[in-house]
A protein has these predicted regions:
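Conserved pre-ATP/AMP-binding loop-to-beta segment of ANL
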Residues: 17, 152-171, 177-178, 213-222
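Conserved AMP-binding/adenylate-forming core of the ANL superfamily
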Residues: 18-63, 67, 71, 88-93
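Structural core segment of the AMP-binding/adenylate-forming
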Residues: 47-48, 75-148
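AMP-binding/adenylate-forming catalytic core of the ANL superfamily
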Residues: 87, 93-96, 104-106, 261, ...
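Conserved ATP/PPi-binding loop(s) of AMP-dependent carboxylate-activating enzymes
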Residues: 358, 371-404, 442-444
Length: 549
């Protein structure tokens, strides 16, 4: 039994070829059409010298071509690299180099950034460009239009051998703020993230054809995953749908009103989103629509699933008031663990509390000695996942050794999330021990933002922390020690750091202090920085930012 992602998708394609696989705007692809285009792409990549295990970047928003790309890359035996479309040139350069990327598929709107990066990343020899209505010049670096390039190649499924040991790469942020490539065997990521385990029972799917048999036996469920495909959770929702013959509705840009229209028009059954950052706009849009005397037909919708960031109980309750008899879930997990636990709320059930979840049998909470925390003890432990876990980080043995550790003969993935185990066995999440900031589901690492801030001529030292935000959960706050005689403004810092880091990492509030506190060894005192933001109001808050507490 070869539990390879390409094989699993092909089983469903063979089972329901005429069923609609993808919808984006006015476009639709059946499973057979998806297969044909993905095969052509795979053959094109191979013709360009892409070999087994070579890395191919996908630099697109959620649209049909990104799914063709995902499937075509794994069919070719290559490894896809998820490229965050918010990245600026320095971040792209690092990712291209770190991944050893040899080919890139990108939307035309990113041509200027690509043009600036490619001269410094010579391994990237092949560039396919997806038309998106923009007019940026991509011929200057040898880019070719996506569909015209693949049209000349075979639509047949005649590829080399595959294995459950083939590698699937998920790039995520690292401790320095730069991305880390998490290497998964296909079988392992299938088991914990792509549907190879029954999430209701915790039991593994027995046979590689079981999911495609479900496709034949059941009508399609319509899924709308809103977060960008750069997130493992959205890749998860998409692959699970493709393995089981369901339909995925794609939204290139998050628009809350458009999301409800899509649910209405396409009879969406499952909605996936990222915590309060998306839940609040969705709720506001729905309320505004109802206040205007309009009604969407949302009778098809039965599940609202939050991934990547837990969303607040108050919003869950409001959703249940507006949409009774629906199921609300939020899930914990990471690129290093896959799904680890879920909190479920439905009408008539009691909420399980804030960030409190029921963990699966392979997720543990360990104390500092590697022993399981006793329920109800009040001891803080660290979340650890065993069983199907990654091989490690790509080209980073040090980080691999730190994150993937063995206790009592069992190898665990330990990305750094702390928790307590309640008396009933449920787990209350306490947060990432590494002081990362979670803003709308995006993990932001302080060191990278601090480095950008300290490049400003008026900044002597700086720390950044997360502060509460009604919409995004947290936003980035800067605690800055100015150079003598200087007083940088938030607007000046904003303009400066945007050339170094993506916009979602830019500080939204500013505290000016006489001295940034550090240890004698120069290590940052984040507790002091956090206390500073809690003890007094910010000196400045971004004029266009709402929702800060």
């Amino acid at each position: 039994m070869a539990l390879n992602i390409a094989d699993l998708a092909e089983h469903a394609i063979d089972a329901v070829p005429d069923r609609v696989a993808l919808i984006c705007g006015d476009e639709q692809l059946t499973y057979a059409q998806l297969e044909e285009k993905a095969n052509r792409l795979a053959h094109y990549l191979i013709s360009q010298g892409v070999k087994k295990d070579d890395k191919v970047g996908l630099y697109c928003r959620n649209r049909i071509e990104i799914v063709i790309g995902m499937l075509g890359i794994v069919k070719a035996g290559a490894i896809l690299v998820n490229v965050n479309f918010r990245y600026v040139e320095g971040e792209l350069k690092y990712l291209f180099e770190n991944s050893d990327m040899v080919a890139l598929i990108h939307e035309r709107r990113y041509a200027d950034r690509v043009a600036n990066v490619l001269p410094e990343t010579p391994l990237v020899k092949t560039v396919l460009v997806v038309e998106d209505g923009s007019d940026d010049d991509y011929q200057r670096y040898g880019g070719v239009e996506f569909y015209s390039a693949i049209a000349e190649h075979s639509p047949e499924r005649d590829f080399g051998p595959r294995s459950e040991d083939d590698i699937y790469l998920l790039y995520t942020g690292g401790t320095t703020g730069f991305p880390k490539g998490v290497m998964w065997r296909h079988e392992d990521i299938y088991r914990v993230l792509f549907g190879g385990t029954d999430f209701a029972t915790g039991e593994p799917v027995a046979d590689e054809y079981d999911l495609s048999k479900q496709a034949v036996a059941n009508p399609p469920m319509i899924r709308l995953p809103i977060p960008p495909m750069i997130h493992g959770a959205t890749q998860s929702a998409t692959w699970m749908a493709l393995f089981t013959g369901h339909t995925v509705v794609l939204m290139p840009e998050f628009d809350a009103d458009a999301a409800w229209r899509m649910i209405h028009e396409h009879k969406v059954n499952l909605l996936f989103f990222t915590g309060d950052a998306m839940a609040r706009p969705l709720l506001d849009a729905l309320l505004a629509h109802q206040d205007a005397g309009n009604e969407y037909d949302l009778s098809s919708l039965f599940l609202l699933a939050s991934t990547a960031a837990l969303f607040s109980t108050s919003l869950k309750e409001k959703f249940l008031e507006l949409l009774p008899n629906r199921i609300i879930t939020d899930s914990i997990g990471s690129s290093e663990t896959g799904f680890g636990g879920t909190s479920v709320v439905a009408k008539g059930q009691s909420h399980t509390g804030g960030p409190r979840v029921t963990i699966d049998k392979n997720t543990k909470v360990l104390d500092e000695d590697g022993n399981e925390v006793v329920p109800g003890s009040g001891v803080r432990g660290i979340i650890a996942k065993c069983g199907h876990i990654p091989v490690g980080y790509f080209k980073d043995e040090k980080k691999t050794a730190e994150t993937f550790r063995t206790f009592n003969g069992v190898r665990y993935a330990i990305p750094g999330d702390y928790a307590e185990v309640e008396a009933d066995g449920s787990v209350t999440m306490l947060g990432r021990g590494s002081v990362s900031i979670n803003s709308g589901g995006e993990k932001i690492y302080p060191e990278e933002v601090e480095a950008a801030l300290k490049g400003h001529p008026d900044v002597f030292d700086a720390l950044v922390v997360g502060v509460p935000d009604e919409r995004f959960g947290q936003h980035v706050a800067a605690v800055v020690q100015a150079r003598e005689g200087s007083r940088p403004t938030l607007a000046e810092l904003d303009t400066f750091v945007r050339s170094e880091i993506a916009g979602y990492k830019v500080p939204r509030s500013l505290w000016l202090v006489d001295e940034v506190k550090r240890s004698p060894a120069g290590k940052p005192d984040y507790r002091w920085a956090k206390d500073t933001t809690e003890e007094r109001a910010a000196d400045e808050v971004h004029a266009n930012h709402v929702g800060a507490k």
